[in-house]
Amino acid sequence: VGGAQAPTVLIGIGGGRILDLAKAVAAESAVPLILIPTSAATCAAYSPLSVLYSKEGKVEKVLHFEKEIDSVIVDGRVLTTEPARLLKAGILDAMAKYVEILHGGEEITAENSRIEKYFAKKMAEDLFLFLEEKGKDAVRALERGEYSKTLSDVFFSNIAYTGLISGLMRGRGQAALAHVFYNFLRGHYPET
């Protein structure tokens, strides 16, 4: 903008769409990126990819990045104010990673797969089991407005741990069933 200096850092604050847009802008501008998620509904703050949408809510483009996010700041007190439906969506998205990896092609073993894919599968299985056990308690704590250890752990799982799994997979070798379903709904029902 007329004589303005180029930014030295970009800060993205918001939900998945805003964070994905911030990642795309930071990559294009080649500036460091700090992300501050306001929802635990996605792993957008941690995953090295951006999903860009049209005004109508349809997926236009998916960008994959080689560079990881420079910094992520998560404030559990902020996340505790999100609607329970967003936390539930994040839990289901995180749990879906295991199912997606299992149904993304050939059997994954340490012997026949890239080692990062093998470890992503193991991590996704642990994540699935953890959220199966703790997810409902976290939702109840959120509904009561209590910032408990379980809720904090689920926030971490939805944002960071799921993002690590996504980063290891690099968007390959997983069915991404949850995303296909979401994109269909979003395209036909933009309010979702």
Regions found by a protein language model. Give the residues of each.
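ATP/NTP phosphate-donor binding region
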Residues: 1-8
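Glycine-rich beta-strand-to-loop/alpha-helix junction loops that act as flexible
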Residues: 13-15
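A glycine/threonine-rich phosphate-anchoring loop and its flanking beta-alpha core
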Residues: 27-122
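Conserved beta-strand elements of the Class I
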Residues: 9-11, 34
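Short glycine/serine/threonine-rich phosphate/pyrophosphate-binding segments
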Residues: 17-23, 43-46, 174
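Active-site segments that bind and position negatively charged phosphate/pyrophosphate groups
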Residues: 112-192
